[in-house]
């Protein structure tokens, strides 16, 4: 019973929809989750620049 409720919640896109007032920011919200990955890549580039001291 619990799993069917979770499936229902995940199948609805209520988590992915912004309120209408914030609709212009939708492209920005799509990109925001990538930013932590960029910091991770930056750490590797930085260590490569200092030869992994």
UniProtKB/Swiss-Prot annotation:
UniProt xrefs under InterPro entries: PSII_PsbK (IPR003687), PSII_PsbK_sf (IPR037270)
GO cellular component: chloroplast thylakoid membrane; photosystem II reaction center
Cleaved propeptide residues: 1-16
Membrane-spanning residues: 28-48
SUPFAM superfamilies found in the cross-reference section: Photosystem II reaction center protein K, PsbK (SSF161037)
Pfam families per UniProt: PsbK (PF02533)
Keyword Amino-acid biosynthesis found: no
Keyword field: Chloroplast, Membrane, Photosynthesis, Photosystem II, Plastid, Reaction center, Thylakoid, Transmembrane, Transmembrane helix
Membrane topology designation: Single-pass membrane protein
Any one biological process term the GO annotation gives: photosynthesis
Superkingdom of the organism of origin: Eukaryota
Subcellular location: Plastid, Chloroplast thylakoid membrane
Subunit structure: PSII is composed of 1 copy each of membrane proteins PsbA, PsbB, PsbC, PsbD, PsbE, PsbF, PsbH, PsbI, PsbJ, PsbK, PsbL, PsbM, PsbT, PsbY, PsbZ, Psb30/Ycf12, at least 3 peripheral proteins of the oxygen-evolving complex and a large number of cofactors. It forms dimeric complexes.
Membership in a protein family: Belongs to the PsbK family.
Record's function text: One of the components of the core complex of photosystem II (PSII). PSII is a light-driven water:plastoquinone oxidoreductase that uses light energy to abstract electrons from H(2)O, generating O(2) and a proton gradient subsequently used for ATP formation. It consists of a core antenna complex that captures photons, and an electron transfer chain that converts photonic excitation into a charge separation.
Name recorded for this polypeptide: Photosystem II reaction center protein K
Higher taxonomy: Eukaryota, Discoba, Euglenozoa, Euglenida, Spirocuta
